[in-house]
């Protein structure tokens, strides 16, 4: 009778900023969809707004935080370099920013976590608990800049 199933824990499922809480599979089929298989593009729920509007004939490439993912239905492309999420649980606000390779979680209390989403997709090894490689430090700097820009 557990809500969380391995490899997730009660702290890394819905209601959290870990992949178990914010990653939702999306299945798309229909007229004009000729791609098959799986795609790991960074899509957020707001992207549905512009995508549906475009499919209904409304023109535009970006409305507020919504980006159309229609190009993904027919070709292997990228629509988003970063994916942003935030959580307010009433006691400690927290924010997450990720790109295809890394994810940074920042809590209002100052705690930070960083994960390699390629080699550690279940976020078991917080990279900030040890010295970062040059590549990891560079990625952290980029994620921090993007998070700061989004939150302004």
Model feature map: region roles:
Residues 1-7, 11-13, 34-35, 46-49, ...:
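C-terminal cap/loop subdomain of S1 sulfatases and analogous C-terminal strand-loop tails that border
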Residues 17-23:
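Short Pro/Gly-enriched coil loops immediately N-terminal to beta-strands
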Residues 120:
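Intrinsically disordered, low-complexity polar regions and short flexible loop motifs
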Residues 39-46, 63, 133, 137:
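Short, solvent-exposed loop/helix junctions and linker helices
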Residues 23-27, 49:
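Structural micro-motif
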Residues 27-35:
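The feature captures the short pre-catalytic strand/loop hairpin that immediately precedes
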Residues 48, 117, 127-152:
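Long, internal low-complexity/basic segments
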